[in-house]
C-alpha cells in the first residue's frame, strides 16, 4: 500500500512548533484594510496557537499522514 499524503491545504496554513503545538495565522488580513484601524491590523499580524483539542488533533492527523 502506498504512503498517505499530507493534506496540501493544511500544509500551507499550519506549522508545528518544537513542542508539538499547532500555529496558525489570523484571518481578515487579506484585503479591505482601509476601514480597519491600525491596532486591529497590528494584532492580525500575530500568529496564534490552536487551542481546541478536537481541531488540534484533526490538524495533526492531516499533517502527519
Swiss-Prot record:
InterPro entries: Ribosomal_bL35, Ribosomal_bL35-like, Ribosomal_bL35_CS, Ribosomal_bL35_sf. Disulfide bonds: none annotated. Residues 1-45 have a biased composition (Basic residues). Residues 1-65 are annotated as: Disordered. It holds the Pfam family Ribosomal_L35p. Residues 48-57 have a biased composition (Basic and acidic residues). The keyword Manganese does not apply. One of its GO terms (molecular function) is structural constituent of ribosome. One of its GO terms (cellular component) is cytosolic large ribosomal subunit. Keywords: Ribonucleoprotein, Ribosomal protein. GO terms for biological process: translation. The keyword Metal-binding does not apply. PANTHER family: 54S RIBOSOMAL PROTEIN BL35M, LARGE RIBOSOMAL SUBUNIT PROTEIN BL35M. Belongs to the bacterial ribosomal protein bL35 family. This is Large ribosomal subunit protein bL35.
Amino acid at each position: 500500500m502506498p504512503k498517505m499524503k499530507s493534506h496540501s491545504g493544511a500544509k500551507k496554513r499550519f506549522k508545528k512548533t518544537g513542542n508539538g503545538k499547532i500555529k496558525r495565522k489570523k484571518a481578515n488580513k487579506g484585503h479591505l484594510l482601509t476601514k480597519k484601524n491600525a491596532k486591529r491590523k497590528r494584532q492580525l499580524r500575530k500568529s496564534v496557537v490552536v487551542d481546541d483539542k478536537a481541531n488540534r488533533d484533526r490538524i495533526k492527523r492531516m499533517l502527519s499522514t
